Amino acid sequence: MESDLTVEESETIKTRSRRPLTEHRRHSLLPLQWKLAHSSRWMAQVVASEFSLLAFLLLLLMVFSKKWLYPSKSRFHQRYPQNITKRVYTSIHSMSTGLLYICISKSCLSSDNEEDNFKMWTIHPAFGVAKISFILAVGLGFVLTVWLHLPYLPCLQRMPFFGLIGIILSFCEVTLIFLTLLLFPVNLWIYELKKNISVPIGWSYFIGWLVLILYLTCGILCYLNHKNFWSLIMSSSSINATCSSSVPVSLMNTSQISKSQADILDPTQDDQKPLSSDNIALPPNPDTTD
């Protein structure tokens, strides 16, 4: 009876020891690709949201900075009267304050060159389109930053069409910023050709290219998450691993099959040996005695 109990106890111990192993394999090895894919997806979402926040802060820096141009480093290639030179400097200074700057001081309102400034910097088509696109870029950048941070809220983690809307907002933002960065120097070059001067561009303009790269990266990451790029990579890697593991097995099977076929086609060594004279049975002699 004791021996039976010990056997039963040993069997129960073995089954208990095997059960966690199978459960560990079931819960750790199988969902490993799922965990890696979803962790990569979440990391891409975090990077996209933080890049959008950084890009929006740089946009605000562009709005409030007054270093779009360097008026002190401007060079005149033609001599002008003092009043015209003053007008040119005033125009360059108003342009260096950025696309969202509006002069409301008394000096701007009561100056004699007020009409000239409006004609040159606000009524000019390239400058007007650049100002509108920059205003839209700032507003859309705020919307995109808020949108990409919504998944941090637990109740909004499963929003439909989240990735698609993020892609559309990101690439619209990239288009608006690129249009602004393209039209601003075009307007400046037209003015330089008209007045025969050269004005260097400031660091606030070049920050816009960094903002463009950040928003473009956000759009690419949103596109990869929307197309389930990380799960596709994990599935392709698992398929390659299974194919590589099945190749040696198939080679072993083919070698075994070829060996068995060779054994069937070739006769054995016993069949190939010639019969000796001792082993040959002679027929009996006929009886000649009558």
From Swiss-Prot:
Topological relation to the membrane, as annotated: Multi-pass membrane protein
Keyword field contains Membrane: yes
Principal location: membrane
Transmembrane segments: 44-64, 132-152, 164-184, 201-221
GO cellular component terms listed in the entry, alphabetical order: motile cilium; outer dense fiber; plasma membrane
GO biological process: cell differentiation; spermatogenesis
Function of the protein: Component of the outer dense fibers (ODF) of spermatozoa which could be involved in sperm tail structure, sperm movement and general organization of cellular cytoskeleton.
Protein name per its UniProtKB record: Outer dense fiber protein 4
